[in-house]
Structure formats: structure tokens, C-alpha cells
Amino acid sequence: MPSKIALLGAMIGLTACWTTAATAQASEKDWTLVWADEFDGSKLDRKKWKPEKSCWGGGNQERQCYTDRSKNIKVADGNLHLIAHKETFTGPDLPPEFSNKPYPQKTQEYTSGKIRTLGISSWKYGKVEFRAKPPKGQGTWPAVWMMPANSVYGGWPLSGEIDILEGVNLGATCETCTGDVGENRMISAIHFGDYAPKNKLHDTRVALPSNALPSDEFHIWTLEWGEGMMRFYLDGRKYWERTSADWETASPLAKSNPVAPFDQPFYIMANLAIGGGLSEKNNDKGVASDVTPAAFLIDWIRIYQCSSDKEKGLACMQGDKESK
């Protein structure tokens, strides 16, 4: 079987088919792969990732402890597996960057996995792309998202947050969804503005053209990010765009910078949360008793930067016309 890397060129061409030929050629030529994890080995690459160990609930009243156990994080069959289980577990209340030793302890009723490139790798502008299969069930909340490496403009959300994929309660009852499979929409969002409760966000929900469940098979998510511009794609189709006219930061450190806070290096992370406000307050409410074990599978994650426009990253981005 060909390796994922060997198939990369063909896959780029397939994705580009949704755009005009001229744009596809420029995009394929100028995007340079700068970082990737194909998850082809038998264990997590610790030179690329740090598992988070915390039980704080992510600030969203989530119900899991994130652990560094193979029960919750494993690499097998060419995929990263982030696996949630129902089990009582006690661990550090907060991630190490939020708390001094000795870390306070907290007990939760679920365990799961979360990995980050924090302190290892971060990027300013580029294309972030991954192939993933989210789990379904009331109470599941898988995500691939980005946070500022250094919080130059201040604490959350003054320095921004980029949520590329959030899959909340997939398959649960949904009266406003199209189709007959229940909740089939995935969320993308950006967070910015001032400290809570004055924080702001823009978000969108997107379903597959077939209205099928995203949890039924793997799909490819793409973020193209340049100075003052973000474009989001699912399986090559653009579904959302934000520009610097849509965001701001209340930080005095921005000094009237019109593209702040999304003009700094961000790191990437992936996790599978259980419960939390966004999940438990919607669809069938709460956490289903049979939702675990649940697994969030990621086939690969690849990050590119624009070789023809290293400063702003805009020249490689696809055109304004929405893909058909």
C-alpha cells in the first residue's frame, strides 16, 4: 500500500480540483510543507506533541481528565486515536502553564486524550490541513484548534483562538438540521475581543453536501490563514471566510494594529472532550450513558507555508469564488 506521503501530491491535486485551474496551479506550486504527522508509527511522536494532563474541564465545565495513558492516546493502524472512557480519575486540576507546583488535584468521571504542539512548534500564517473522523453521540465534543504560542496581546481571548473543527453531539436529535440523521453540522469559530464577559466570537456550522453524518467516514478540513484573512474548507469546498474587518482585540498592546490578534504564531492541538456547556445544553442535553468508549481518529495533520509570500501568506490562498 502506498504511504500517505507518497499519496500527498495526488491528494493536493484532488483538493485543488474544486478551484479554478489557475488558482489550483499557483496553490499547489507555492504551498510548502513545513510540518506533518502522518501517525504511521506505533506511538505518539514526542518530538512533535505534548499530551496535556489536566482535569480542569477546559473552562467549559467539561467532565474529563486528560491523561497521558495509552488507554486515552494511542497511535495504531495509521491513525491517532483520542479515546474517551467513563471512569473515575484524579489528576492535576490545571495544565502546567496555568498553575505552579504542587498542582491542585481534581476528580472527574471520564478520561480522554488531548495533544498539543505548545512549546514545540507554532506557525504564523499558512495552510493547516488534516484528515479526521469525529465520533458521534450526545456529549462528545472533538476538536482541532489553535491557540497563540505566546499570548502577546494578553490572556484569553485578547490574543485570539482559532477553532477549525468542533463536532458537538453528532447524531443526536436535531430539529433544525437538514436530513434525517440528527445533528450533522460541524462548527468553526474564532474568539477575540476583551476579557469575559466582554469576549466575542464568530462561528459557523457546516454540513456535508449529502447531509450524512461526518462521523461515518474520514473527511479533510483545511484552514488557509494569511494576514487579515482566514478561509475554511471541508473536503475542498470553502464554507466560511473571515477578514480582519470581522475581528479585533481590546489589548492596548495591539497599538491600532488592524490585523491583531491573528498576526502571531499559533500552536495546534487536538482533543476529545466529554460534556461541557456547548454539548450538554444542546440536542438531547447532558451526556448519554452509552456514549463511551468514544474515539476521535486523525489520519494525518499537515502544515504548509507560502513560499512566494512568506511575510503575509496571502499569495497562495485560493480565490474568492466559493467552490462548487
What are these regions (language model features)?
Residues 1-5:
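Positively charged n-region of N-terminal signal peptides that target proteins for export
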